[in-house]
Design a protein with these regions (language model features):
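Glycine-rich phosphate/pyrophosphate-handling loop used in enzymes and phosphotransfer proteins
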Residues: 1-187, 191-224
Length: 224
């Protein structure tokens, strides 16, 4: 979108905090609500049966305004909120701290978990890509869409953990050479870990040296 049209949108529809509805200049939350809703967590992969992942980081709890915003983006075509989520990644300090804490190598490759092609076609955009691509490039990381879905899957919500793992089993393949490369796997939502582990498993089988995982939100019962 051109800067002129974006300016008009901001004038007539100024951005507001998704939680308290107060005016904001960037991102999707005001400072107070950001402090309230941020739920930075490092998860132990073993607890989620994710042996192919070194460590997992979540930035927001999938609840309240965050959950509503992601639903608006994923099911109601609110692409403008997707841009706000990308801004939010730039505003947050925790992603930078996590990268430093994990001591990620300089040649880290950021790989988004691909959304089912049917859902991308319906929405007109890919949510993980929209949230993380700009952020990764600002960090100086290589952005690489190295994974593709080779079959469609059912939505994960409503399925138990074993059903989710069965649903995504064998749904990914690599479309780029990632042999010997360290990978930072990114997604919009992390819940049971089924999708992330399946993606990490194929990356490791295809030669990735290490895989870390990062998600915008997590901790509820829904998934992709």
């Amino acid at each position: 979108m051109s800067s002129f049209w974006q300016l008009l949108i901001d004038i007539f529809f100024p951005p507001v905090c998704i939680e308290c509805r107060h005016r904001i200049s960037a991102g999707m939350l005001c400072t107070a609500c950001r402090k309230k809703l941020q739920d930075f967590r490092i998860l132990q992969p073993r607890a989620y049966c994710c042996p192919d992942i070194e460590s997992i980081c979540l930035f927001y709890r999938y609840d309240a305004g965050i959950k509503k915003a992601l639903h608006e983006v994923k099911f109601h075509g609110k692409k403008r909120l997707l841009a706000a989520m990308a801004d939010e990644m730039s505003i947050l300090e925790t992603p930078k701290r996590v990268c430093a804490m994990w001591n990620l190598p300089a040649n880290i490759v950021v790989v988004p978990i691909p959304t089912d092609r049917k859902r991308v076609a319906q929405r007109g955009y890919d949510v993980p890509q929209g949230i993380f691509s700009q952020w990764s490039q600002k960090q100086g990381f290589v952005w690489c869409e190295a994974l593709a879905r080779i079959r469609s899957t059912e939505p994960q919500y409503g399925l138990d953990r074993s059903e989710r793992r069965k649903n995504v089993r064998g749904c990914f393949n690599t479309i780029r050479d990632i042999r010997g490369k360290p990978i930072l796997l990114v997604d919009d939502i992390f819940t049971s870990g089924a999708t992330a582990e399946e993606a990490a498993n194929i990356l490791r089988k295809q030669g990735a040296s290490h895989v870390w995982a990062m998600a915008f939100a997590g901790g509820a019962d829904d998934d992709k």
